[in-house]
């Protein structure tokens, strides 16, 4: 088997690289063992959130000039980095990944996303179902109703409430029981975000959940829900927002990440649509060298069949 480029790894960096190369006319193969960093994604993307000394960054591109010379961004250079940054929203849009609208200005600003522990973390871009606050001082609302599924332990409502109350939002925690989700509780291993999200793909299920949230509201101006909706159809999250008479904020759970897996699937689809070959559930186990250059690799599933390429890209997080 001969390709122009073989990419080892199936996460964000490998998929972005593979899509760009495939669209540029290269013949690409991607080898992915399966789970990758997108399965742990927050649904937000960072460019430069903090300086090496821990200082928060407000304007990432402006802060690049203060980085040490050995930093990758310094080596790329601000001008080229700016060009890459400008192309990101369009790239994701072409792949079907919807982001918050970005103003076409020379200066880009970081916002803050709410983590699964209720803390704030700098972020540059976010999927359109992830809430970004303009600053650390911004309150999400005056009164928040935090709603979880009964028995779902991967959404820590207490931590979220503590974090929000420190910033001046009064919080009340409630849980909802749905027959369809209760079936998952028979096996604790099944009570995970992705499995709940699959149940919530059904119109009857997410509508029933939204109706129960409506009944729980008691003067709150914001409702906080676990990010376990829109696994197949992200528009479901918008429909839920339209049904609930308060501002609705989705906050990520502990992994696996529903928005992350959704993004990985969309990027994989875009890579294959561009003509790329994707080996899922396989891994590179051996390499043959021509001098200091990798000439071919062997994978676990292909036995003695070697894969040759002009270039190999290692994007496996190792």
Question: Where are the model-predicted features located?
Answer:
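Helical element adjacent to the flavin cofactor pocket in flavoenzyme catalytic cores
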Residues: 155, 159-167, 200-218, 222, ...
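Conserved beta-strand-loop-beta-strand element in the redox core of flavoprotein oxidoreductases
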Residues: 268, 285-306, 312
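Short, well-ordered coil/turn residues at beta-beta hairpins
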Residues: 9, 147-150, 226-227, 300, ...
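Dinucleotide-binding Rossmann-like beta1-alpha1 core, especially the glycine-rich loop
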Residues: 47-133, 138, 144-145, 149-152, ...
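N-terminal Rossmann-like FAD-binding beta1-loop-alpha1 element of flavoenzymes
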Residues: 3-30
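Short hydrophobic core segments
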Residues: 6-8, 31, 284, 307-317
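Conserved N-terminal glycine-rich FAD pyrophosphate-binding loop of Rossmann-like flavoproteins
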Residues: 33-69, 180-196
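Helix-loop-beta segment of a Rossmann-like dinucleotide-binding subdomain
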Residues: 70-73, 131-152, 172-176, 182-195, ...
